[in-house]
């Protein structure tokens, strides 16, 4: 097979699929599998849409998941109000503010220095596949990197 015919991106997706299966990580397995199907079919025409809106849609779905206990009543209004008087909850609010700030810095860094995106993605996917992490890391990782780089 000629190097010009060799699709490194497909190989990476296949390796990620294998990592997801091996580590029993459904998120990586499903994501890699879906992207392989898109890549090998006419669905590939939707890649620009996924690239432009995928992150926002993912954040919206994640936020819906986080807010569902409030909407369903599983987390009562009384419990929410009491949380403002607990040192653990106040610390959690502070950490949440810090993480949101880091995510904002991460978006700026990834936009201004696209050469680091591949490394951040590889690190995040490896963390998800091998360490059973959750794929919310690239923005936060980029935010932390922006602090390390003094950017």
Curated annotation (Swiss-Prot):
Pfam families per the UniProt record, alphabetical: DUF441
Keywords: Cell membrane, Membrane, Transmembrane, Transmembrane helix
Membrane topology summary: Multi-pass membrane protein
Subcellular location(s) of the protein: Cell membrane
Highest taxon in the source lineage: Bacteria
Ranges annotated as spanning the membrane: 10-30, 53-73, 84-104, 116-136
Disulphide-bridged cysteine pairs: none
Main location: membrane
Family designation: Belongs to the UPF0756 family.
Annotated PANTHER family: UPF0756 MEMBRANE PROTEIN YEAL
Name under which the protein is recorded: UPF0756 membrane protein ACIAD2383
Organism for this UniProt entry: Acinetobacter baylyi (strain ATCC 33305 / BD413 / ADP1)
